[in-house]
Structure formats: structure tokens, C-alpha cells
Amino acid sequence: MAKIPSVKEMEDFLLQDSKTSDLVAAGDTNAKSPDTKLTAHQVQHEVSVFSRVLINVYCGWPFHDEILKRRVLQILTDIYKNAHDMTSLELLEQLKQVIKIIPDNHINLNMVGYHKEVRTGLRKQRPNVGSNIAGDEKFIIDLKNDIGIIGIRTLSKWSAEERESFDKQWRAILPKSKSLIVDIRDNGGGSSRPVESLARYILGHRYPAARKEIIRNNPDANAVKKLYKNSDIDKFNVDSADDPVIYSDHSAEVLPKFDPGKAGFTGPVYVLTNGRVMSSGEIFCTNMRYYPNVKFIGTNTRGGEVYGYNYAYMLLPYSHMTFNVGCVYRDMFVENFELNGYKPDIECEDGTDAMDVAFAQIGRKNFMVHQKGLEK
């Protein structure tokens, strides 16, 4: 009977055709056509580089179970052993098998410039509870009588001027608001700083987002850390430690109780969510869970905080596809977060607008608000 290889033996086989110096950040690399021809040897090298990123750089690899690892490694081994001349698009279709089974809503393989992107196949359909009030804008802030309304559709690619304007506007309306509605529906993430600043002001204190934040510590992971030297990864001093993983541990912290005297806002807050909310969009939910007078209205968020912190965009050498992975793993306070996201306090049925439910909660059922991006 043939010996069944261990996970470590399967990993070593796939890593033999690449080295640390093959780990290159995507940067502004020119896109290549999906029809780019790859030789069998180039395919094998691409698979090995892909495997090196997955096994040694990707923050989630140590935390996935052995069954999943074996499935992934067997797929990659089969692609490697059966390599033949093919196009970049054909290779993407083969590597898709790996991405689709990893329960991570951030990890993706992207053929830049050609709208060819592969993400996990584990996303769930959520009910339609309306779209973000900001419509096509990044954010919108308004005050209707004594109700503050903040819609944040995206946190991606904000300019310094936009961040300053956002901060100035919400600081202007909160003192005049008795209730606050924060609409984060459709918010797939970006930089979390604007929403963390808002949450910290409301709470009067910064609370940890996770029990632990964990980073890989090996030559490949540390090389990638240097490629992204201006990121938050710098707070982990990996070069001076021998542990395979290093973490900042919040699990034993005594969390401060909510203090109305220090809080910037003490009225009811209604946070609107849907199934497209993930990543930095969910960080506002993570922070506001500590607020005693908050209700989440809508549907479960997607679940995208465990593996998506500090993204690394890694280049595959011949196809110029980018393999994008998180570098910091978050041990969340919510179990199975990546599969379930945050569950709302008030769950809306399909076709029910979460904004209407929020106003009903406030007791203004007949109060009409102009809603950009929502059809009445």
C-alpha cells in the first residue's frame, strides 16, 4: 500500500520549485492578456509561487483544519504534476478550485485589467433589505429634526479631504441628535479609520476588535512584511522572535464599562446592515457591540474580518495574476465569524427596507426621509 504523505510532505513538494526571492508585490505591474501562453515549466513555477504565498504568507493557513489543507494541497499537487502548456486563463480556472473551497471572504485571485477575479464560493445569499442611503456617493450625512443620519457606502479610496469632511460633518450633527441611524449597507470595506473614529467618539473609549491578532513569523512572511513596510504589520516585531506565530493578546483584558460621562453620544443608535457588509464595514459593528443602546437592523453581514487585515497583493511571475491574501489573523470574539458575520438584533424579511424599520423603532412611522439609492 502506498504511503499517504503528511501535510508537511505535501507542502514541501509544492515549495521545491520556488524560493523566497520569488515573492514580489504586485504594485503597478502591467496586466497581461488572459491568452498569454505559459509553458509547462512556467505553470509549475506559478503553482509553486502560489503555494508559497498560501502556505507561508497567508495568515489563515495555520488555522484551517487538516481536512481542508489536504484537499487544497492535493488540488495543487495535481495541477503541478499534470502541468502542460496552457493560457493564463486556463491556469486561473484550475487554481479557482483552491480559492473556492477556502472559507475566507477576502482571499482572491485576480487577473488585473481583465475583470477576471475568483473569490470563495462559500458566500450566502441574504435577503434584500434595501441599499445604502448614500447611493453613488461614498457617504452622506444629514440631520432630520433630531435624528442624525449617516450613510457610509464604502470606505475605499477616500481622499484626505473626504476623511476630514466626514469627520467634520458627523461632529456637527451628533450634538443636535437625539437618535442616530448609521447605514452601512453595501459597505464592503476599505480603510477602517473613519468608522473607528466615529465609534470611538460615541463610546468614549477604544475597544479591541478581537481576542488576538496573529501574524506569521517565517522567512517568507517576513520578506512580505518588508514589502509592505508602511502597513500596520510593523507593530509586530517579528524579526526578534523565534515563535512561528506572534500575536497581540487582548483575551485577558478587563474591558472598561461604558461610561456616559465620557461618551460622545448616549442616545439610541440604529446600525443598518445587509449581506454585502464586510471587512472594514464590519469593524463599525465590532466596535458598536460595546455600546449599550445600539440595535442592528437588517440581515447578517457577510463575515470578513478574520483573514482580511493587512492585505498583501502578490504577483505570479508569468501570468501576472495577483494572489491576494490577508497577513494578520484575527481571533474574533464571535465564533465562526467568517461563515456567519454579525446577526442583527432585528432581522428584516426579504423586501423590507431596514431604514423604514429603523424609523419605526424611533417612533416616527410617518416621518419621510429622502433616500438616495432606494426605490420607494
What are these regions (language model features)?
Residues 292:
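Active-site-adjacent substrate-binding region
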Residues 1-233, 254, 265-270, 283, ...:
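Flexible, low-complexity junctional segments that flank or bridge functional domains
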Residues 208-214, 239-250, 326-343:
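Extended, charge-rich low-complexity interaction segments
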Residues 328, 333-376:
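Low-complexity, Gly/Ser/Thr/Pro-rich intrinsically disordered linker/tail segments
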Residues 251-263:
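Glycine-/acidic-rich phosphate or pyrophosphate-binding loops and their flanking alpha/beta elements
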